[in-house]
Swiss-Prot record:
Protein family membership: Belongs to the tachykinin family.
Lineage, top ranks: Eukaryota, Metazoa, Chordata, Craniata, Vertebrata
Record protein name field: Protachykinin-1
Keywords, comma-separated and alphabetical: Amidation, Cleavage on pair of basic residues, Neuropeptide, Neurotransmitter, Secreted, Signal
Origin superkingdom: Eukaryota
Propeptide segment residues: 20-56
Signal peptide feature range: 1-19
Chain positions with Methionine amide modification: M68, M107
GO biological process annotation, one example: positive regulation of cytosolic calcium ion concentration
Compartments reported by the entry: Secreted
Pfam families: Tachykinin
Gene Ontology terms for molecular function: substance K receptor binding; substance P receptor binding
Main location per the UniProt record: secreted
């Protein structure tokens, strides 16, 4: 354990000395040179600029994946238009929603009535014990 601490201290001291040697060679005053934007642009390497542009770029709307999954921009607009037409009497919705006694959410399937839910929970518990 003491050897590990000694190696860590040696590493930190050597990096500090190396950083001081590099800092002594630089004659730049970073606080006064912020007005020279041309000098800053020239000093910035190409890959670093590219990385900053990638970070600053915002995703396109069709690249957004929400909780509902991937959405296609064209089909969602068509679905909205069809829904508006159906609501205002210009068309029909062909698919109907069938209500059941269970709800499937993010946490899994849940029963809407508590008696069926308790019964299924007890059956699952007894099935696991066997």
């Amino acid at each position: 354990m003491k050897i590990l601490v000694a190696v860590a201290v040696f590493f930190l001291v050597s990096t500090q000395l190396f950083a001081e040697e590099i800092g002594a060679n630089d004659d730049l005053n970073y606080w006064s040179d912020w007005s020279d934007s041309d000098q800053i642009k020239e000093a910035m390497p190409e890959p670093f600029e590219h990385l900053l542009q990638r970070i600053a770029r915002r995703p396109k709307p069709q690249q957004f994946f929400g909780l509902m999954g991937k959405r296609d921009a064209d089909s969602s607009i068509e679905k909205q238009v069809a829904l508006l037409k159906a609501l205002y009497g210009h068309g029909q919705i062909s698919h109907k929603r069938h209500k059941t006694d269970s709800f499937v959410g993010l946490m899994g399937k849940r029963a809407l009535n508590s008696v069926a839910y308790e019964r299924s929970a007890m059956q699952n518990y007894e099935r696991r014990r066997k």
